[in-house]
Amino acid sequence: MPELPEVETTLRGIAPHIEGKTVEAVVLRQLKLRWQINPDLGEILSGRQVLSCGRRAKYLIVRFQTGILLIHLGMSGSLRIFTPSDGRIGRSDRHDHVDIVFSDGTVMRYRDPRKFGAILWYEGIEEHHPLLEKLGPEPLSEAFCTDYLYVRLKAQKRAVKLALMDNAVVVGVGNIYANESLFRAGISPHRPANRLKKKECALLVETVKAVLRRAIETGGSTLRDFVDSDGKSGYFQQEYTVYGRHNQPCPQCGGLVVKETLGQRGTFYCPNCQK
């Protein structure tokens, strides 16, 4: 599933190509994603100019004068940009579900083999959208700080990894990056969240930010389907320390990385280095 770095990579790829441009048409090949696409989306968007693009948690936001297009990549989605000079614009396959065509010939194509993503039109206040209004702070923002995390975790007895992946606590820290951040902070994913000392919260905030920044720099992780707006894979997976490395040597102590299930998600850690 694309996590925050992959969504941010996508945002940075599409924004320069569509901001300020006017939608000419929308081609809908498949309406049934996680939530059904409005069949009138083409009529709604035609003639509207894109004011800006943004991201909140794992949601991409395309802003217009009187509404927003909220896009979630689901388990396997991606957005590709095709320009008039690209001979592949007309070539689509069964996984290419939506094309947004701009007046200059640019096409933004939504591809989703597993059809678990979403493209939603909303004309209310952005922050009040039901999918956005209860989200926690962005992990790369100043709001996600030591004091904030320490207070939030003090009231929680569940495992720290589960708390870290809760979008009400902090957004966008999915399974891959939770595993990697906890390893680099030396904290066991099983530790009760309310047992973390303040200095450990400070270290965890630092490692979460560092891991996410590095992942964005490397274009995110490509394990199966993810590609950026140019169709290129990310390569942060080459820098994994524990994720996906079950029974392989820990890069710090040489002991074996363990895989367990926590909250129905694969959890990778080093029992020697993480306490």
UniProtKB/Swiss-Prot annotation:
Chain residues that bind DNA: 95, 114
Keywords: DNA damage, DNA repair, DNA-binding, Glycosidase, Hydrolase, Lyase, Metal-binding, Multifunctional enzyme, Zinc, Zinc-finger
InterPro entries, per the entry: DNA_glyclase/AP_lyase_DNA-bd (IPR015886), DNA_glyclase_Znf_dom_DNA_BS (IPR015887), Formamido-pyr_DNA_Glyclase (IPR020629), FPG_cat (IPR012319), MutM-like_N-ter (IPR035937), Ribosomal_uS13-like_H2TH (IPR010979), Znf_DNA_glyclase/AP_lyase (IPR000214), Znf_FPG/IleRS (IPR010663)
Keyword Protease: no
Reaction equations catalysed: Hydrolysis of DNA containing ring-opened 7-methylguanine residues, releasing 2,6-diamino-4-hydroxy-5-(N-methyl)formamidopyrimidine; 2'-deoxyribonucleotide-(2'-deoxyribose 5'-phosphate)-2'-deoxyribonucleotide-DNA = a 3'-end 2'-deoxyribonucleotide-(2,3-dehydro-2,3-deoxyribose 5'-phosphate)-DNA + a 5'-end 5'-phospho-2'-deoxyribonucleoside-DNA + H(+)
Renumbered zinc finger spans (FPG-type): 241-275
Pfam families: Fapy_DNA_glyco, H2TH, zf-FPG_IleRS
Keyword Nucleotide-binding applies: no
Cofactor(s) this protein requires: Zn(2+)
Active site feature: 2 (schiff-base intermediate with dna), 3 (proton donor), 58 (proton donor), 265 (proton donor)
EC numbers on record: 3.2.2.23, 4.2.99.18
Biological function: Involved in base excision repair of DNA damaged by oxidation or by mutagenic agents. Acts as a DNA glycosylase that recognizes and removes damaged bases. Has a preference for oxidized purines, such as 7,8-dihydro-8-oxoguanine (8-oxoG). Has AP (apurinic/apyrimidinic) lyase activity and introduces nicks in the DNA strand. Cleaves the DNA backbone by beta-delta elimination to generate a single-strand break at the site of the removed base with both 3'- and 5'-phosphates.
NCBIfam families for this protein: fpg, PRK01103.1
Record's protein name: Formamidopyrimidine-DNA glycosylase
Organism the protein comes from: Neisseria meningitidis serogroup A / serotype 4A (strain DSM 15465 / Z2491)
